Regions:
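Short helix/loop segment flanking the catalytic signature motif in cyclic-nucleotide metabolism enzymes
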Residues: 89, 116-136, 169
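Catalytic core regions of nucleotide second-messenger enzymes
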Residues: 58-61, 109, 138-154, 170
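Catalytic-core segments of nucleotide cyclases and related cyclic-nucleotide turnover enzymes
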Residues: 128, 132, 146, 160-179
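Conserved nucleotide-binding and Mg2+-coordinating catalytic segments in signaling enzymes
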Residues: 19-37, 69-82, 91
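Hydrophobic framework residues that shape the active-site pocket
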Residues: 74, 93, 107-110, 115, ...
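Signal-transducing coiled-coil linker helices
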Residues: 1-26, 32-50, 57, 62, ...
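Short catalytic/binding micro-motifs of nucleotide second-messenger systems
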Residues: 49, 99-104, 136-147, 178
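Heptad-repeat coiled-coil signal-transmission/dimerization helices
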Residues: 35, 39, 90, 94-97, ...
């Protein structure tokens, strides 16, 4: 019985360590490493379907799209109100993203003020609609910082896997679409 308890403790510790290695503590989303590892699995499945649809009758993932968001004028927000205000903006965007995507989709804080979504089964048009919904919702969302009520906007870019050979290609396409 003691052995089972020790095994359970080890499993829980492994789970905790994996979460801390793959999650961004501030936004509660995946970090870059965790997102990329998960996204590559789905992307490989979508590419396999595209290249060889005859190999199987059903595929888990037939489409995969990325959406990248960047908080507009984030440096100015930090410089004007302080880093805690910037942190609140990051938390607000992370929370709003999670409210607007499905449980199967992926979301990460890619770094700094940049966020990325992996939309499972989505084509470019689907991704655009989701990105536009998030962009509009953020534009109308206010967050409280101390006694101040602040707001911010985001810019985004989308791309689907159809023109990409790998994750890096797909990321570059979505990043380019942002500008």
């Amino acid at each position: 019985m003691a052995q089972k308890s020790e095994i359970q403790k080890l499993k829980e510790e492994i789970k905790r360590l994996k979460e801390s290695a793959y999650k961004d503590e501030l936004s509660k989303l995946y970090n870059r490493h965790g997102f990329k590892e998960e996204a590559e699995k789905f992307l490989k499945e979508a590419i396999a379907f595209q290249k060889h649809p005859e190999r199987r009758e059903s595929f888990l993932v037939k489409n995969f799209a990325l959406t990248i968001f960047d908080i507009d004028n984030f440096k100015q927000l930090n410089d004007t109100y302080g880093h805690q205000a910037g942190d609140e903006a990051l938390k607000t965007l992370g929370k709003l993203i999670l409210e607007r995507i499905r449980d199967i989709d992926l979301a990460a804080r890619w770094g700094g003020e940049e966020f990325i979504l992996g939309l499972i089964g989505a084509n470019e048009n689907d991704a655009y609609n989701i990105a536009d919904d998030i962009r509009k919702k953020i534009a109308e969302t206010k967050f409280k910082y101390g006694k101040k009520i602040l707001k911010f906007t985001v810019s985004g870019g989308v791309a689907d896997f159809s023109q990409a050979k790998n994750f890096e290609d797909l990321f570059k396409l979505a990043d380019k679409a942002m500008y």
